[in-house]
Design a protein with these regions (language model features):
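Juxtamembrane helix-boundary/capping and inter-helix hinge elements in multi-pass membrane proteins
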Residues: 12, 41-44, 113-116
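Hydrophobic alpha-helical transmembrane segments
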Residues: 23-42, 99
Length: 148
């Protein structure tokens, strides 16, 4: 919780908005749009790959949430506050992070297929930013995003 309290101490309204936008990049809707766009516009094979990885990743993620039953950080420590705009989507258990898992599946899957170093680096940075945003918003712990 120490890292989460440190992140809580640096929150600002501007950073809250930026991190809220970044976290959307790991959302299920964004993942589905990217997978379909890759399928239609880039490669059916890569699109199928993203869809399959995303589907099974989501199933495994939900199974682990139910199996482990790890509460959200603010449930573990009622003195901890989250960015309120993130509360609506932060339902259920905390471990592992679905947004981070989606980012790893989507951007990691895309990085696997690209030969462009700059794009591969950008995709990895996006994945790390989504994981960081989940902790900044206060909805996940480092363990939640690290395992995802």
């Amino acid at each position: 919780m120490g890292l989460l309290y440190a992140l809580e101490s640096i929150r600002t309204p501007v950073l809250d908005k930026i991190m809220s936008v970044i976290t959307l990049l790991g959302g299920e809707l964004f993942f589905m749009v990217i997978a379909v766009a890759v399928f239609w516009c880039v490669s059916k094979r890569e699109g199928y790959y993203l869809m399959i990885v995303g589907f099974f990743g989501t199933v495994i993620n939900q199974f682990l949430k139910i199996l482990c039953c790890v509460p959200r950080p603010w449930v573990k420590d009622p003195g901890f506050t989250i960015v309120e705009s993130a509360r609506a989507e932060a339902t259920g258990y905390s471990f592992p992070s679905g947004h981070t898992q989606n980012a790893v599946a989507t951007y990691g899957g895309m990085a696997r297929y690209t030969n462009k170093t700059w794009l591969r680096v950008l995709l990895i940075v996006l994945t790390v930013l989504v994981a960081f945003s989940r902790m900044y918003l206060g909805v996940h712990t480092p363990l939640d995003v690290g395992v995802s």
